[in-house]
Regions:
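Active-site entrance/lid segments in N-terminal catalytic domains of soluble metabolic enzymes
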Residues: 1-165
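Conserved active-site-proximal phosphate/metal-binding subdomains
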Residues: 141, 149-165, 173-291
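Gly/Ser-rich catalytic serine loop of serine hydrolases
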Residues: 2, 169-174
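Active-site glycine- and acidic-residue-rich loops that bind
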Residues: 110-119, 171-172, 215, 230
Length: 291
């Protein structure tokens, strides 16, 4: 979740045996703040095993490269395409040039590169854009997402690019679901909504308790137009925030996270599987018990 991906939560997930992440969207374009938190994570855990996500053009290529190289990060995720927030795609040729310019030096470090997708990508584009795998969002996912189920996109992507590493993002909250995806060949399984409601997440206790009382049928689907493309967002809406905001609903999100009466938080169908606030250790133990 934008703003929910904090170094404190990442450390807790790592200590619980999970594979944590940090998202550049948390840092308001300040790459030095992301570097600071990454340094803190590595010092606190003694590990560089963390997944970093960036939106194309959000930072300079050099800034992204230096962050990844500083601790030889094993995996990164790039968010780009016709839904790119920071610069709508002018042409596929321009996009390819930009992606290769960013990713070629990073790939040379040995880092595996994932692309966030809402729709399937063919083998030609995967190879052309130097992609190793895909982080797959669908109708069950939190925040910006697609209309087709995660499982359907996952299975289609597996058939189209059998050598790709795949990470499903959305709707997972039980040990049986985790095992099913692992058995289907998932590299790992994301459980962002469940961890967003963990004891260690930055959401206020008031927000967590309010969310636990809800189910996925209570989620709202916002729509935004970015770069002439309409996108939807799955969110738990409190009283609507009426003030100025950006395309990602960041101010409303911060109010929702802090327990204000107006605002929202980005949650997915995984909310159906959260009935109480638990530690990351308890959550990960529960979700991996069938493996």
């Amino acid at each position: 979740m934008n703003k929910g991906s904090t170094v404190e939560l990442a450390i807790a997930v790592h200590k619980a045996g999970g594979y944590p992440s940090l998202c550049s969207w948390t840092y308001n374009g300040r790459s030095e703040h992301m570097q600071r938190d990454l340094d803190h994570f590595v010092k606190a855990t003694g590990s560089n095993r963390i997944h970093l996500s960036f939106e194309l053009h959000e930072y300079t290529n050099a800034e992204v490269y230096n962050i990844v190289k500083s601790h030889m990060i094993p995996t990164i995720e790039i968010i780009y395409g016709d839904k790119n927030t920071f610069r709508p795609t002018n042409s596929e040729q321009d996009l390819t040039v930009d992606v290769i310019g960013l990713l070629k030096p990073i790939k040379d470090l040995g880092t595996k590169v994932f692309k966030r997708i809402y729709d399937n990508v063919d083998q030609t584009m995967m190879d052309q854009h130097l992609i190793d795998g895909f982080c797959i969002k669908g109708s069950e996912s939190a925040g910006f997402t697609g209309h087709v189920s995660v499982r359907e996109v996952f299975l289609q992507q597996k058939a189209m690019t059998p050598g790709a590493m795949l990470i499903p993002y959305g709707g997972v909250g039980t040990a049986e679901q985790v095992k099913e995806y692992i058995d289907l060949g998932a590299e790992t399984v994301a459980v962002g909504t469940v961890l967003a409601l963990s004891a260690e997440s930055p959401l206020s206790t008031e927000t967590k308790l309010a969310a636990i009382k809800k189910q996925s049928k209570d989620l709202t689907q916002f729509t935004h137009v970015v770069g002439n493309v309409e996108r939807k967002q799955n969110a738990l809406q409190f009283e609507p925030y009426q003030g100025p905001d950006d395309a990602n609903g960041t101010i409303g999100l911060l109010r929702g996270m802090r327990g204000k009466s107006d605002g929202h938080v980005y949650l997915g169908k995984g909310i159906d599987h959260v009935t109480k606030i638990q530690s990351c250790k308890q959550i990960i133990q529960r979700l991996t018990q069938c493996l």
